[in-house]
Regions:
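Short amphipathic helix-loop junctions that connect adjacent transmembrane helices
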Residues: 29-45, 223-240
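Loop-to-transmembrane helix entry/capping segments in MFS-fold secondary transporters
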Residues: 43-44, 127-137, 237-238, 321-331
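Helix-loop junctions at membrane interfaces in 12-TM secondary transporters
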Residues: 91-102, 286-297
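C-terminal membrane-cytosol helix-exit motif in multi-pass small-molecule transporters
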Residues: 152, 171-190
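Intracellular juxtamembrane helix-capping segments at the cytosolic ends
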Residues: 112-125, 306-319
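Helix-to-loop junctions at the C-terminal end of transmembrane segments
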Residues: 60-72, 156, 254-266, 350
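Glycine-rich segments within core transmembrane alpha-helices of 12-TM secondary carriers
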Residues: 132-150, 334-342
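Structural signature of the two symmetry-related core transmembrane helices
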Residues: 75-88, 269-284
Length: 350
């Protein structure tokens, strides 16, 4: 196939990001309202569902074994297709068992895709350009999310679209974009052949620790913040969509600049600033009793989270280039571990 100027690894990463966001952002935005309205979920059931969602994350380390059979790029396509199928089917199974099943299917695609995407990004991008490009990908994801939340706001607020229709459109869009990537982009090869076995290196200990602790923090945000908005403050689907739109407008405006900032000031200063800011945000979360203030904290947390790309660029600088694929799976598993532990400790199982 003759290659064109637009058929570059960077553009492929951008299209992958758009496809994933269209499906996953829809799933996340509708989840709390859908499970409460259609399946009468309580905190216990949502906790079980979120734990099921993390099971494939535990298995992310098996990525290296799959890569013995297929290329990383092809595996990314397959994972995105599975993600799209899982989301497309979600609206048609509004029962406890059905939601657990579709969540698991969606999660298999999502977690394997995220693992492979991290590996491919660090292989395809140079050390100098990685912070800026990773920041740009966050901005692209925010723009795609804005499209999703605008669609949700209009679809449920004015067009009265059903959950089934919205889920199917989102998952189908992801699947169609995946077919486009499969047929429209050539196979890119890594300059450095990747090791195809599991490994843990002592000199990567700080990267493992930062990734592990980041997983616990994200669980608080990903699960409790959204559920809090619906349960405590009575946010509707259109309210959640509007909040997410505001959030992603900020990310669209600042994410690329944050990536450039990380490249300029270095990973240590960037992460120090992030953690100091998050200390203030989560302290405020403990005392908030206003829906407006809760929404503001939600946006602030997302902005600080953009600085977490510094963890990836730090690893890119210290790692053996041949370790990207094998370490990505181990690192993603270390993100998932504290999440399930946190859910167990939260009392959702009791």
């Amino acid at each position: 196939m003759k290659e064109h100027a637009w058929q570059t690894p960077k553009n492929l990463l951008i299209v992958m990001t758009i496809a994933m966001t269209l499906a996953f952002a829809t799933w996340m935005a509708l989840l709390n309202n859908f499970v409460v309205e259609r399946a009468a979920f309580t905190g216990k059931e949502i906790g079980i569902l979120q734990s099921i969602r993390e099971i494939p994350g535990f298995l992310a380390f098996t990525t290296v074994f799959v890569l013995l059979l297929i290329r990383e790029q092809i595996f990314a396509y397959i994972s995105l297709a599975v993600l799209g199928i899982g989301v497309a089917l979600s609206g048609y199974f509004p029962s406890e068992a059905g939601l657990y099943l579709t969540t698991f299917v969606m999660s298999v695609g999502f977690h394997y895709y995220e693992t492979v995407k991290q590996s491919l990004s660090l292989q395809w991008l140079s050390i100098d350009e990685a912070p800026a490009v990773l920041g740009k990908l966050i901005a692209v994801s925010s723009v795609a999310s804005l499209v999703v939340y605008s669609f949700l706001w209009l679809g449920q607020g004015y067009l009265s679209l059903s959950y089934e229709t919205i889920y199917f459109v989102a998952g189908g869009s992801c699947f169609i974009l995946t077919l486009f990537m499969w047929l429209g982009f050539p196979t890119f090869t890594s300059v450095i052949p990747q090791r195809k076995h599991l490994l843990l290196r002592k000199r990567y200990w700080l990267y493992y620790a930062l990734t592990f602790m980041g997983g616990a923090r994200r669980q608080i945000f990903m699960v409790f913040a959204g559920f809090l908005m619906v349960e405590k403050f009575g946010y509707s689907v259109s309210d959640i969509a509007a909040l997410f739109m505001i959030n992603h407008l900020f990310n669209w405006a600042f994410a690329s600049r944050i990536g450039v900032l990380v490249g300029r000031i270095g990973e240590r200063r960037a992460l120090t600033f992030e953690y100091c800011g998050l200390f203030c945000v989560f302290t405020a979360y403990a005392f908030v009793d206003s829906a407006a203030w809760a929404g503001a904290l939600y946006v602030a947390d997302h902005l600080f989270f953009s600085l977490a790309i510094a963890i990836k660029t730090y690893f890119q600088k210290i790692a053996d280039p041949a370790d990207m694929a094998s370490t990505a799976g181990v690192a993603f598993t270390s993100i998932i571990s504290p999440r399930c532990l946190f859910q167990c400790c939260s009392g959702w199982y009791g």
